[in-house]
Amino acid sequence: MKQFDYIRAGANSDVTGTPDATIIAGGTNLLDLMKLEVMTPDRLVDISRLDLKQITPTRDGGLRIGALVTNSDLAADMTVRSDYAALSSALLAGASGQLRNKATTGGNLLQRTRCYYFYDTDQPCNKRDPGSGCSAMEGANRLHAILGVTDKCIASHPSDMAVAMQMLGAEVEIEAADGVTRTVPLSDFYLIPTDPAVETVLQPGELITAVILPAPAEGRQTYRKVRDRASYAFAMVSVAARIKVTDGKITQAAIACGGIGSMPWRDPAVEEALIGQEPAREVFGKAADILVAEATPKEGNAFKVPLARRTLIATLTELTGVQQ
């Protein structure tokens, strides 16, 4: 690990006023990257003591989650468990208990890909070293994305939490250097990797202060994760979904997927294919076909196309009670 300057922030302005600094909160991802010298910041700003640790109701019946709320505390919150069950399940499906105790809401959104080549400084990687190439294109790509990829990068986004938040229609609250706060829909927060080194709309000196969840929506919701082992493994495919059935027909649908996209993946066309339909495996299959219609798999991750179809169908079957 290379030498760096360390600053402990006492106010948000200590962060937004130092745009050249790297932010550290729980450090569960950043410290690994620093030890491997994938990231070599000259200056760290520790935000762990900022007043961003509250979960509070919003005026419209939603929830404001401070950026420093830990994954463990968020998963255990009674309102989250009752009204945003898919989010609680997604959080508990990620990492380990020890990591969830340290990992924060803002840090989870900003965690870096687990692409092997991003972590190997001897290999070309456009995320780590722009313009050097993407080793995963012709190399080991089993974990990689099949949607939202470019000829510059096929890395998948690793977060479980962000997939559930994408399905729930979350917004990210961001504070700039001038103290002005803006909110960005999570659906607009992440960027397709045309420039793989730029992953989000965050500008230098900006700080995530909270995530805003809308008022709870009607219907049943769940989070399903398919992975190599039962715990402490990233998703090959995951689905966060909410479905409402009224008078025998689907009237509301919200679906986001993980493990298959360069970002938490939500395709409105998949949801639209379900609205007005009677729940049935044939209907779910057509929606699943839409999900993977534009997939561009590589040799190592081609299995994700049928796996994504099956996972979505199984999730919708569970939520609607359709007989197998």
Predicted regions and their residues:
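C-terminal structural segment of proteins
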Residues: M1-Q324
